[in-house]
Amino acid sequence: MSDQGVDQDIEPTALSLLTSTEAARRTNERRTAAIVPTGAVEQHGPHLPLNTDLLIAEAVAKEVAGSAEGVTAEPLAYGCSWHHTSFGGTVSVRTTTFISLVFDVCRSLSDSGFVPVLLNGHHGNKAPLQVALTDLAETGIRAYAFSYFDPLAGVLAEVFPEPSLSVGHACAMETSMIMHLRPELVKREAVPHGGTPPTWPDPHMFGGDNVSVVRPFEEINPTGVIGRPEEASAEKGEQLFQAAVARSSEAVAKILMETP
């Protein structure tokens, strides 16, 4: 059989590229995860593209879908980014809009027999995602969500000498991962230096106090950056990306083993 024939026999992992018959066969044959990348279109400093969160989440999701014999649904590109709207190019949706969209997408995937799994790349989406999962559960639909970066604490400690100062937003981690995935999109001459501003973490949020606050990002740092992007490298990005894929694949495998 020719290479062309082999390629034609392999179904794509992108849900939207399947036929309706192929999608139904997937869910009839086995419990199948439909992985929905969620991200944002928002400022990531002067050196990274606006779609940084989505770009990383999509790349991780594609790898995970392949290893888990799942599918990737179309990504939810716009997220909850109100705190970045003073920076050019940021596009934000209201939390209620985001929650409603997640609810409807997951309900449709569940109706088609898939296990909805939201693979998130933007911290601002985490709280709304939890609300959406609760709303879905109240209607009898079980969906799952996790952020690719949450399981990386141990790896970050290996890669960066002071991860609490190196990692935040448009930081050493994200810059490294984009250097690995899409190096042509990194404006290396514009990478800012100077580290995390002294106002972060918020000096009023004392250790042990569970206090929440939402502030515009320019109050934290007018450069749009938290962390030390100057510490980034493509090699570090590859290590972090592979770790994100491995940890995310483990999470999806555990999800699929759970009794529905």
Task: Describe the residue ranges of each PLM region.
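Extended, histidine- and acidic-residue-enriched regions that form the cofactor-binding/catalytic faces
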Residues: S2-P116, H123-P260
